[in-house]
Design a protein with these regions (language model features):
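N-terminal leader/targeting and accessory segments in enzymes
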Residues: 1-87, 91
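Walker A (P-loop) phosphate-binding motif
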Residues: 90-108
Length: 108
């Protein structure tokens, strides 16, 4: 898959950059995957970027102000990484799920 087919606002320099899949879990990253470094309430995915790269990630998407190619790894900045992950997942899978389940809660 090529970045230009899935990312609308990607620089033309990177449109032909190949990727094989996506992951937001560094331990599940495979060769040439995109790693989405998502910051959560307790765990920051940015802390696992090196692990994702050692597992084969060639592209890292992060909310940190990092952009461009560094040591063969393409870093892409996103202001809304969760939305981008959802959009790219939909484009790759090309289907709407039959069921959507949501869990909500309160603090008391």
């Amino acid at each position: 898959m090529l970045l230009g087919d899935y990312f609308q606002n990607i620089q033309s320099t990177y449109k032909n950059f190949f990727f094989s899949g996506i992951s937001f879990d560094s331990s599940q990253v495979k060769k040439n995957n995109i790693f989405f470094a998502i910051k959560g309430n307790k765990i920051d995915g940015n802390d696992f970027i090196l692990s994702a790269i050692s597992n084969g990630a060639k592209i890292v998407i992060t909310e940190k102000k990092i952009n461009g190619l560094k040591n063969g790894i393409l870093f892409i900045h996103s202001n809304n990484i969760r939305k981008l992950l959802a959009e790219i997942s939909f484009k790759i899978n090309n289907k709407i799920p039959n069921n959507i389940i949501a869990v909500t809660g309160t603090n008391g």
